[in-house]
Amino acid sequence: MLLIPAIDLKEGRCVRLRQGLMEEATVFSDSPAETALHWFKQGARRLHLVDLNGAFAGVPQNLPAIKDILAAVAKDIPVQLGGGIRDLKTIGQYLDLGLNDVIIGTAAVKNPDFVREACKAFPGRIIVGLDAKDGMAAIDGWATVTGHHVIDLAKRFEDDGVNSIIYTDIGRDGMMSGVNIDATVKLAQAVRIPVIASGGLTGLDDIRALCAAEKHGVAGAITGRAIYEGSIDFAQAQQLADSLD
């Protein structure tokens, strides 16, 4: 079970949002590169970046911070990024910078053909991020809940060639209320590619529950607020996950 620290970027700083609201941002660091190095030293084997401004603007907005992070850690561990990725040119630019994978979110739901095109152009490098409320996909920074069921979308994107799915239960993210294990397992059982859980991780009990779900295809978990506020010690949590594998 891979635990992946999240670094959410807003105006060049490392923040966490509550329920996806930009006005509900808590600043944790003015130096995202130092934050990335910290998690690497704590034993992180992959990092998850989100360009929050980019997600709302539809184009990259935090390139200096992203470049600094990649300069600090990309030679040692893979880094993935989402937020504002709407075209193939942006994907190519990001991969050229040294990102290992890019995550397509809102654009995947609005324009599923874009995912197929991206997988053809950059095979093995595309992840789709699906955010859901009560099983239905949400888009535009969670502002809109669609009529598309996440399982139907995940199956389509699997056929298109994405390497994994990141699943966020938007009722849980940033609320420290526990991971929605049942919904995550249900999605993982519906596809053959790995599913990464995101949203709501609170403590070691969540780690144990996720490890128990690994046999169903839940390959990892992205953690944010819990490791920044200290309810989870990242190094301890990754050691626990490794011991349960």
Swiss-Prot record:
GO molecular function, a single term: 1-(5-phosphoribosyl)-5-[(5-phosphoribosylamino)methylideneamino]imidazole-4-carboxamide isomerase activity
Species: Neisseria meningitidis serogroup C (strain 053442)
Catalytic function, reaction form: 1-(5-phospho-beta-D-ribosyl)-5-[(5-phospho-beta-D-ribosylamino)methylideneamino]imidazole-4-carboxamide = 5-[(5-phospho-1-deoxy-D-ribulos-1-ylimino)methylamino]-1-(5-phospho-beta-D-ribosyl)imidazole-4-carboxamide
Annotated metabolic or biological route of this protein: Amino-acid biosynthesis; L-histidine biosynthesis; L-histidine from 5-phospho-alpha-D-ribose 1-diphosphate: step 4/9
Major site of localization recorded for this protein: cytoplasm
E.C. code: 5.3.1.16
UniProt subcellular location: Cytoplasm
GO CC term, one of those recorded: cytoplasm
CDD domains, per database record: HisA (cd04732)
Protein name: 1-(5-phosphoribosyl)-5-[(5-phosphoribosylamino)methylideneamino] imidazole-4-carboxamide isomerase
Keywords: Amino-acid biosynthesis, Cytoplasm, Histidine biosynthesis, Isomerase
Annotated catalytic residues: D8, D131
Pfam families for this protein: His_biosynth
Xref: SUPFAM superfamilies: Ribulose-phoshate binding barrel
Top-level taxon: Bacteria
Keyword Transmembrane helix tagged: no
One of the GO biological process terms: L-tryptophan biosynthetic process
Family: Belongs to the HisA/HisF family.
Encoding gene per record: hisA
InterPro entries: Aldolase_TIM (IPR013785), His_biosynth (IPR006062), HisA_bact_arch (IPR006063), Isoase_HisA-like (IPR044524), Isoase_HisA-like_bact (IPR023016), RibuloseP-bd_barrel (IPR011060)
